[in-house]
Amino acid sequence: MNRDTICVQGGYTPGNGEPRQIPIIQSTTFKYATSEDMGKLFDLEADGYFYSRLQNPTCDMVAKKICELEGGTAAMLTSSGQAANFFALFNLCEAGDHIVASSTIYGGTFNLISVTMKKMGITATFVDPLCSEEELDAAFQPNTKVVFGETIANPALTVLDIEKFAKAAHAHGVPLIVDNTFPTPVNCRPFEWGADIVTHSTTKYMDGHGAVLGGAIMDSGKFDWMAHADKFPGLCTPDESYHGITYAERFGKEGAFITKATAQLMRDFGSMQSPMNAYMLNLGLESLHVRMQRHCANGMAVAKFLEAHPKVAYVNYCGLESSPYHALAEKYLPNGSCGVVSFGLAGGREAASTFMKELKLAAIETHVADARTCCLNPASSTHRQMNDEQLAAAGVPAELVRMSCGLESSEDLIADIAQALDKI
């Protein structure tokens, strides 16, 4: 089925006389006739629902739609994109393990990996996304369990060479996780290029209106966990908390990863998306394919205007022919990338501050990727926790402005940008 149709009708097919829109199952619990029936659910011997902290029918319908969009075999929703990335990584790693990650990832995820997970005994090596195959290979250690990157990094807007990173990961017997938030599956499907797990902050383009927080995790169903059983004991050895179930044996490579993440991590951490948020997310998904076209068109128009302006020192947008990532964008993102543009002003950080203050249509917000245009200075906000060396490695200099182009008229956006630049 075409992705446009999946956006509108995927995940839920109503029967005769049933609601045309997905129902909101706003219930914490579910009734069963016997304790034996419920016991089968707790033993993972039957499908169904017993507590919405782990699973909920509304959430599962939306997860199924996103899974269909990405071309995966299993999926789950989480309360936020940050929760999705944590679950995806922690589902594979434990104390003593190691992660290889792109250095230009979102600041919150960088902090998650470099600080919070370090406290859990999990270390990481960060690599330049444009590193050579030899440099990438050198980052691996005997205890490396996963490779992580973003299709389009936030806010440096670097493009991940998914095939290169997948090849390296698989050569070392570990999966590649790709955060596909910015392009969405409308513009890129990382599974088609070798990724094994895909994550999303559904708060961004999927919701599209700055209304609901959420995240999602999808499994390609292609990574053979049992072939690397020594690396992934959590998937390939009995789980004492579920009467000795071995996930990779019981659910196969198509379902083991998501089942474990749901049964263990969602059970213990409780980062479940609410049914109401899932319902509103689905409303956003129904127009995702249409909105992404406008976001990309506006992003390109703004990027071209900025590139030609004398007060702009540089522009990061992979759609521009001048971008060092343009060839990768043509390969992985032939239909467009996203509506986010980042750029540096010739006057430095002070000029960036003045520019943002003078904007009329674009609001200064920490958010990104919704219907309304917004901007921020990442070095003083989303990446504030990084030191100067880390900021440089992440591609986030002090003067950088990140602008998320919304659905307004591109002419109005450019006029607003022009008048703000005139005030510098």
Give a label for each model feature:
Residues 34-86, 108-116:
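Conserved N-terminal alpha-helix of the aminotransferase class I/II PLP-enzyme fold
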Residues 1, 114, 123-124, 138, ...:
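PLP-dependent enzyme catalytic core of the Aspartate aminotransferase-like
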Residues 47, 73, 277, 281, ...:
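Short amphipathic alpha-helical segments
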Residues 1-56, 64:
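N-terminal "arm"/small-domain region of PLP-dependent enzymes with the aminotransferase-like
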Residues 7-13, 75-308:
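Conserved PLP-enzyme active-site core in the AAT-like
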Residues 14-16, 206, 270, 331-333, ...:
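Short Gly/Pro-enriched turn/cap motifs at secondary-structure boundaries
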Residues 29, 220-223, 345-348:
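Short loop segments at secondary-structure junctions
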Residues 292, 300, 304-307, 311-401, ...:
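Conserved C-terminal alpha-helix-loop-beta "cap" of PLP-dependent enzymes
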